[in-house]
Amino acid sequence: MVTILQLLVSILILLSFALVVGVPVILVSPGEWERSKNLVYASAGLWFGLVIVTAAFNSFVI
């Protein structure tokens, strides 16, 4: 159980880092927002879902 929680947290950290670096680059690049808008929204939705799943799973571990 703890290993799964550690894996979820690691994925959350990696996705957070990718979003922190990637979203500003997409917003600054000319014309990139129109092409990558769906990817940004999908990544943000995945991040939010991962936060909820990690929090729910954490309540079972501790």
Curated annotation (Swiss-Prot):
Membrane topology, from the record: Multi-pass membrane protein
Protein name per UniProt: Photosystem II reaction center protein Z
Sorted UniProt keywords: Chloroplast, Membrane, Photosynthesis, Photosystem II, Plastid, Reaction center, Thylakoid, Transmembrane, Transmembrane helix
Gene3D superfamilies linked: Photosystem II PsbZ, reaction centre
Pfam family name, one: Ycf9
GO biological process, one term: photosynthesis
Family classification: Belongs to the PsbZ family.
Compartment(s) where it occurs, according to its Swiss-Prot or TrEMBL record: Plastid, Chloroplast thylakoid membrane
Transmembrane residue ranges: 8-28, 41-61
Main location, first listed in the record: plastid
Organism listed in the record: Guillardia theta
Function: May control the interaction of photosystem II (PSII) cores with the light-harvesting antenna, regulates electron flow through the 2 photosystem reaction centers. PSII is a light-driven water plastoquinone oxidoreductase, using light energy to abstract electrons from H(2)O, generating a proton gradient subsequently used for ATP formation.
Domain of life: Eukaryota
A cellular component term, taken from the record's GO annotations: photosystem II reaction center
Subunit structure of this chain's protein: PSII is composed of 1 copy each of membrane proteins PsbA, PsbB, PsbC, PsbD, PsbE, PsbF, PsbH, PsbI, PsbJ, PsbK, PsbL, PsbM, PsbT, PsbX, PsbY, PsbZ, Psb30/Ycf12, at least 3 peripheral proteins of the oxygen-evolving complex and a large number of cofactors. It forms dimeric complexes.
